Amino acid sequence: MLTLGRKTLSVPILQGGMGVGVSLGGLAGAVAACGGMGCISTADAGYREPDFARDPASANHRALTAEIKKAKQIAKGAGMVAINAMVATQDYAAAIRTAVEAGVDAVVSGAGLPLELPGIVGTTDVAIAPIVSSGRAAKLILRRWAKEFGRTADFVVIEGCKAGGHLGFAEDDLLAGKCQTLDDILPEVLAEVKPFEAQFGHSIPVFVAGGVYTGADMAHFTAMGAAGVQLATRFITTYECDASQGYKDVLLNARPEDVRIIHSPVGMPGRALNTPLVQALAEGTRFPPRHCARCLKTCDPAKVPYCITHALIEAVKGNVEEGLFFCGANVGRLDRMRTVQELMDELVTEWRQNL
């Protein structure tokens, strides 16, 4: 058993948050039911709501509440149900408060430094965790939390350079293959959390993500001192994943050479498949937003090359022409559909065999 805040996991596996609409209550609940941590992405969780175009904030908060309750019902008290909240999003704080009110077990936060997260969550039993890509970032966040809020992280997630979606590395370094590896970053983060473990009198488990694919990978990192791992791309090709089968088929058919590093309106690089949209953007084509929901703090709709909300919603529907399909570096290894239980059992069995 692994303690994270006031809750425990029987399996040290986190399912990474994937928006828009890829990881909602169905997937998160199934992972939690297996003893892991399922994670709902707050990014436009209400994209299917009838009033989403007119009032996205209300639609998203209503849907987020429903998805958390759905996940909890599926989990039946097992594991943990979390949300992934991106600092870069306009409704960041409001989404977290909605999730806390809905009974979420943990908030995992990245796409920027979640410096204010303890203040947003408040004096609740909800576990909090930053997503970091360096020991320096971990130290900066934990020092701020300790000084300003008298609190520390309940766990930390390291996302390495092989992760899917938004990446906390310089675009030039990603393209040149010069980023630190998880093997480099993990010891740094473990060293940085130690003073805060001593100060607050409890362990701060560290999970690694980004390129973790097998139970053998899991064994490698737990032997180095990680408490467990986070996977995302592998969970897309499960029956319980909330994306359309069309979305899943695109990833199942992807080859290693189809992966690209793209620039996101979030202001960060990202890893995605080389679809017609990505190809057109690389050639300099601009796709002006048809309708702006003001989903990002830094986005200028008059200048942005494309609307990431529209592109991700089209992807989750399976629209290859207009969709942006985020993926991890190992997407080419996906071979078939599985149930969440089958995938979790496979990972845990391989992990134990390689310990």
List each language-model region with its residue ranges.
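Conserved active-site-proximal phosphate/metal-binding subdomains
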Residues: L14, A163-L182, L186-F207, Y213-L355
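Active-site entrance/lid segments in N-terminal catalytic domains of soluble metabolic enzymes
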Residues: M1-Q199
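Residue-level detector of alpha-helix initiation sites
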Residues: V22, V212-Y213
